[in-house]
Amino acid sequence: MSYAEFLEAKMHVGGNSGFKATYLPDCLFDFQSALVEWATLKGRAAVFADCGLGKTFIQLAWAENVVRKTNGRVLILAPLAVGFQTVTEGEKLGLKLTHDRDGTEKKARLVVSNYERLHYFDPKNFTGVVCDESSILKNFDGKTRLAITQFMRKLQYRLLCTATAAPNDYIELGTSSEAIGEMGFSDMLSRFFKKVERTMSRRDEHQGCNYRFRGHAERDFWRWVCSWARAMRRPSDLGYDDAAFRLPPLVVRDHFVKANSPAPGMLFEMPAIGLQEQREELRRTLKERCEQAAELANSHSNPVVVWCHLNPEGQLLKKMIPDAQEVKGSDTDERKESTFRDFALGNIRVLVTKPKIGAFGLNWQHCSNVVYFPSHSYEQYYQAVRRCWRFGQRNTVKVDVVATEGQRQVLDNLKRKADAASAMFEQLVGMMRNELRIERKNEFVKKEEVPTWL
């Protein structure tokens, strides 16, 4: 073995464990076909594509290729209430998908279910698995996340699809890598990163922002990510035309609500400082904020989605908005699915729900009016807005953010996170674009340079 071959062998780059795609529907765009071909050839891959770029078509085409190659079955895991949408999208491709809630369907080739129902299924009955909106895996508790990862480990073909705001959470990238069998997130952290501080809590160790790249590892890290994942916000990120994928204008308006009474023990209203005071202010201004949100929702005759975070908010909003329907955590899965379906079909004008319930995976291009109660989570805000502001939306999307005076810092924090996420994704896409053109050269063994006078 030469020295160059020795160094080549030490590089950690994912290989191919798939096959050449034979099923590429004519309705796919060129970049979608390219991603299907790439993911099928990889066998185990991740696609980080922004909202509205057709991830459902991509994953269904990939799953059909696995079915035709292995004559086996593929399980498609999706967030709650997204299953019916996946089945509908499959019909557009001429594919028959079965929505199985309890693992009793044994003959269907393409099976759709929810993450929460994974325990009903046996991996021995499948040859491939798709995790739709895989970024929500980090929202599950450790037991559920471990069960999903262990289920995937037993299958030969694996695909992750998500439209996360920006894959700048290194832990999430490590979790994705572990799920598809490339490298565990603990191994990833020890190989490419070092802790910012030596003293950390166990909770801090699961926050990607507390790690930084080792001095030599950043380029190698993104080369490794490129070996099993593709990230894109628009087709041009992969060298294709953006003509059919133009986002409509987005108008964001902030509405600040003042409390009618000061905090207990105060003579006049003071800005909320810290999380505890912000929460107290939210509960104290519950009525005022809901009145403002209801006024905004009632001013539209078109569909509106109102995003809240507290149960009392949802209950009061439903009372203040005459034709509103609420989806809450205590609802049965069947009721959640039916309500989301009715809203998508236009049978419900105003939908009230929480981002953690309905902000992932659903397509609501028919709705262009959003009312949002902010929190510190940028991902929830991003995903909530992108249910409506996505490719395929024909109208200007209006987002009304209803906040208290004490939440100005929260909005500033969201803007800071948005700028950081945009910069991170810009850097990531640029690095991926460069890495796709990398030619491996021997830059370590060079000829000795001899002075010209010798």
Identify the function of each model-found stretch.
Residues 8-48:
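Conserved pre-motif I regulatory segment
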Residues 42-62:
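Walker A/P-loop
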Residues 56-61, 71-92, 167-172, 309-311:
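Conserved Walker A/P-loop ATP-binding site and its immediately adjacent core
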Residues 305-307, 315-316, 322-358:
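Conserved helicase ATPase core of P-loop NTP-dependent helicases/translocases
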Residues 376-454:
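A conserved SF2-helicase RecA2
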